[in-house]
Amino acid sequence: MPRKLRDLPEEGEIVMATVERVEDHGAFVTLDEYPGVDGYIHISEVASGWVKNIRDYVKEGQKVVAKVIRVNPKRKYANLSLRKVTDHQRKEKLKEWKREQRAEKLLEMAAEELGKDLDEAYEEAGYKLIEEYGSLYDALERAAAEEGPEPLLKAGVPEEWAEKLAELAIENIEPGRVKIEAYVDLTCPAPNGVEIIREALEKIEEFQQGDVKMEVQYVGAPRYRITVDAPDYRTAEKMVRKAAQAAIDHVEEHGGEGEFHREIEEG
C-alpha cells in the first residue's frame, strides 16, 4: 500500500483506513498509509446525529476516509472521525489514494526489473520522490510531462531508478494540468517607485492568456510569488520565466533592480 514519509499521522490529517472490527460502541481500523498504526472510530464520530446501528455505516473490510482527531505516539494509535470529513475532502482523498496506488504499482514494476523488492524501492527512490514532490504520483507525472528522468534525478534518485521510472511513467501516465511557483524580487528607488513596481506586476499578469493562468502575490518586501497554472510543465516553466523577466526589465528601465528565483531557501 502507498506509504508516507512519517511513521505517524498528524492531528487534522485526512487518512485512508480499513475497518478490521466493528463493535456496538465503535470501529477498530488500521491506517493504510501508516504500517503498524491502528485507529478507533467511536460511534459518536461515525455520522452526524444519532446512530442507532453502527453497522449501517461501517462494515469489516470496508475502506473509509477519516480525519485524525488525536494521536498517541507511544501506542502508535489514533482516534478518528468519519463525520468530520467533508464531501470534498473525501473525494480528494479517494482521488489521491487511487493515484498513489497506481504510482506505487509503477514503482513495484521498476523494482522487479531492477531485481529489487518494494522496501528497497522506497528506500532508494520512493521516499526521495515523496520528499521532493509531495507524492509518488506527482513525481512520476512530472517525469511523464517532461518526457525524461531529470525531475527524478533532481530528487536525488539514482540514475538506474530514474531512467526506469521515467520510462514507465511516460508509458503509463497522461500528464494533467500543472501548477508551479516561482519568485521575483523587485525594488525601485525612484520617487514613483511604488507605481513602477505596480506596473511591473501588471506586466506579469499580461502573460495570462488562453489556457495559462497567472497569479501574483505579495510575500514581503521586495519579494513576490508568481503562481502559474498551465497544461504542462514546459509551458509553465517557459511562461513564469518570461513573465518574471518582463517585470525585471520594467523596473530596470526605471533605475530599479530585479531578480528571479525559481525556488527559495526555507528558513
Curated annotation (Swiss-Prot):
GO terms for molecular function: ribosome binding; RNA binding; translation initiation factor activity. SMART domains: S1 (SM00316). Residues 12-83 form the S1 motif domain. Keywords: Initiation factor, Protein biosynthesis, RNA-binding. PROSITE patterns: S1. InterPro entries: NA-bd_OB-fold, S1_domain, S1_IF2_alpha, TIF2_asu_arc, TIF2_asu_C, TIF2_asu_middle_sf, TIF_2_asu. Belongs to the eIF-2-alpha family. eIF-2 functions in the early steps of protein synthesis by forming a ternary complex with GTP and initiator tRNA. Heterotrimer composed of an alpha, a beta and a gamma chain. This is Translation initiation factor 2 subunit alpha.
